[in-house]
């Protein structure tokens, strides 16, 4: 792909669906078989989006750097949070619910940082697709729709996490009311 050549990043085919991602520590783009071998506008848009992340990395886009630094921490903390939540529900321990609330709040904040990263990568993808003449007129509109739909998944995930956070707060408040 021409976009790859511009960013001097290696691209590999990997197994799975919806597993496409840019790995900033290894400076490589992993694309699922359908995207890697695809010729559809959707395949081009997804591949270009991942190239957008590589460009963010190369240009030191601040939200990308923050997000990349937070990924390992959030992954570990999220695991602990759900484990703590399970213990609190089974054992009725409100201390673990409070811990889970704090951890879920950290997850929500991480998702807030992720949104501008994903939106910016999609914008960069569209610029690359246009500059390299990989899409024309209606194809450009289709690529925008694909990338907008992808962004909506991040928004939906954020809203879901916010609702989970509110649910935990309500559980904690109801347990505190029961103790009064």
Where are these regions (language model features)?
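Active-site recognition of the HExxH zinc-binding catalytic motif
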Residues: 45-60
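Short juxtamembrane and helix-loop transition motifs at transmembrane-helix boundaries
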Residues: 58-68
